[in-house]
């Protein structure tokens, strides 16, 4: 009995459970005959893991199946391309483009579109630029309005004729609209209310028609202050030397000076009046 047993069968060796050297086959046969599982198999079953050999076999099977599927697809596509006409094949190729290729083709086909203007943030750009933009918009609106009713806009622009009024000894300036008055008399009364320290001779609405140099001198000597004006030529003239309509068109500014200083303007006023007449 002892002679039948080999020492290798009873020899103890250190190693991992289920593994070993030359006695692996005998140990596997003994385990299969005894019906007991090894330590590694027990752990795999508890963790629901497949043995290493089975996992490798499954991976090989999956790779072979995937390769077979690819070969079948290539054969089918090749047969379709042979049967299809060139336009149909091109259309099929266009249908199977990747998303990146289709986006590139679309971008190349469409013309370049301008970017949408950004919404203006309140308070930016700075105030000066913002005001320039507002003025530009208002100018455009003004042009449109002028195109629609140019006669009305021209009449509105000519409706006012503001001129500055100064007086010798007065520390301030005033401004009057000559279009508000219809004669020299109305303008004289308005100036008297503005500057109560001067008097002015009365002139008719026709200016100095029928007035000679002596009458102008008497007018200047009889008043403490005399209104004068600067015309478009830059000459200082006496108020009342021309008809009212001509005065309104040519007056640039008014000055109320002392009568003694305005005496030298009388001959010049008479000369200019004669030349215009």
Curated annotation (Swiss-Prot):
InterPro entries, sorted: AUX/IAA_dom, AUX_IAA, PB1-like
Induction text: By auxin.
GO cellular component, one term: nucleus
GO-annotated biological processes: auxin-activated signaling pathway; regulation of DNA-templated transcription
Biased composition range(s): Low complexity: 24-37, 84-94
Residue stretches of biased makeup (Basic and acidic residues): 64-75
One family name in Pfam for this protein: AUX_IAA
Entry keywords, A to Z: Auxin signaling pathway, Nucleus, Repressor, Transcription, Transcription regulation
Region feature Disordered, mapped onto this chain: 13-38, 53-119
Positions of short motif EAR-like (transcriptional repression): 12-16
Similarity field: Belongs to the Aux/IAA family.
UniProt protein name: Auxin-responsive protein IAA30
Organism of this sequence: Oryza sativa subsp. japonica
Gene: IAA30
């Amino acid at each position: 009995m002892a002679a039948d047993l080999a020492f290798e069968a009873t020899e103890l060796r250190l190693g991992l459970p289920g593994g070993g050297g030359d006695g692996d086959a005998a140990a596997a046969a003994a385990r299969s005959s005894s019906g007991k599982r090894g330590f590694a198999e027990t752990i795999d079953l508890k963790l629901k893991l497949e043995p290493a050999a089975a996992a490798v076999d499954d991976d090989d099977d999956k790779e072979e199946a995937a390769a077979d599927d690819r070969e079948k697809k290539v054969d089918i596509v090749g047969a379709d391309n042979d049967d299809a006409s060139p336009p149909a094949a091109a259309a099929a190729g266009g249908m199977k483009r990747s998303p990146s290729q289709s986006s590139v083709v679309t971008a190349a086909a469409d013309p370049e579109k301008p970017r949408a203007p950004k919404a203006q943030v309140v308070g930016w750009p700075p105030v000066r630029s913002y005001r320039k933009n507002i003025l530009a918009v208002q100018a455009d609106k003004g042009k449109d309005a002028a195109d629609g009713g140019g006669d009305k806009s021209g009449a509105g622009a000519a409706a006012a004729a503001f001129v500055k009024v100064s007086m010798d000894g007065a520390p301030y300036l005033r401004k009057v609209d000559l279009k508000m008055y219809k004669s020299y008399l109305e303008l004289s009364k308005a100036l008297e209310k503005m500057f109560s320290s001067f008097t002015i001779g009365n002139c008719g609405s026709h200016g100095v028609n029928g007035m000679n140099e002596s009458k102008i001198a008497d007018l200047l000597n009889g008043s403490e202050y005399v209104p004068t004006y600067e015309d478009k030529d830059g000459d200082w003239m006496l108020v009342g030397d021309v008809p009212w309509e001509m005065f309104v068109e040519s007056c640039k500014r008014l000055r109320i000076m002392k009568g003694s200083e305005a005496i030298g303007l009388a001959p010049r006023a008479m000369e200019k009046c004669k030349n215009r007449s």
